[in-house]
Amino acid sequence: MTKPLTKGEIVLFALRKAGIASEATNIDVEPQSFEEGINDLEDLMAELQITFGDLGYQFSAEEENPTSDDASGLPRKYKQVMGYQLMLRMLSDYGIEPTPRQEASAAAAYDALLTDTLSVPSIARRGDMPVGQGNNYTALGTASYYVERGFHAKNTDPVS
């Protein structure tokens, strides 16, 4: 069984991709920025719930503050999507302009989320389709443009 994706993992991903914190460059994460990142994640997920509906994210209770060890409830495949979207928000908090590469990565991840959550409607015909004159398979009466079935016009032209 895979380890559940935590809120702290998403925030660390966003901080790392933004270049704000990284273990490779020994830049430690400030506790205040980490806490703000988790709160930003909660806000981001509330906004994404409007567009995508329920993705399975587990919001923290109103009485308690979210922590980094809380399970997010999201599948692991959404780590990059949420991380890149959170990264864009965090960069604006720090007054840093995102690079075109960061914006392209965030857009590609968001498009992947759109594709993954897309629900294709059934292509079967509806039962309440209107049947017009052209779709009517029974022949119309003599007062109509079409002749009745079984009626064969005889040659009434006197010349032939």
Curated annotation (Swiss-Prot):
Name of the protein in its database record: Peptidoglycan hydrolase gp27
Gene Ontology molecular-function annotations: hydrolase activity
Gene: 27
Family annotation (InterPro entries): Gp4_sf (IPR038258), Tail_accessory_Gp4 (IPR020362)
Pfam families per the UniProt record, alphabetical: P22_Tail-4
Purpose of the protein: Component of the cylindrical core that assembles on the inner surface of the capsid during procapsid formation. Required for stabilization of the condensed DNA within the capsid; perhaps by plugging the hole through which the DNA enters. Plays a role in ejection of the bacteriophage DNA into the host cell at the initiation of infection. Functions as an exolysin that catalyzes the cleavage of the glycosidic bonds between N-acetylmuramic acid and N-acetylglucosamine residues in peptidoglycans.
UniProt keyword Hydrolase, yes or no: yes
Localization per Swiss-Prot or TrEMBL: Virion
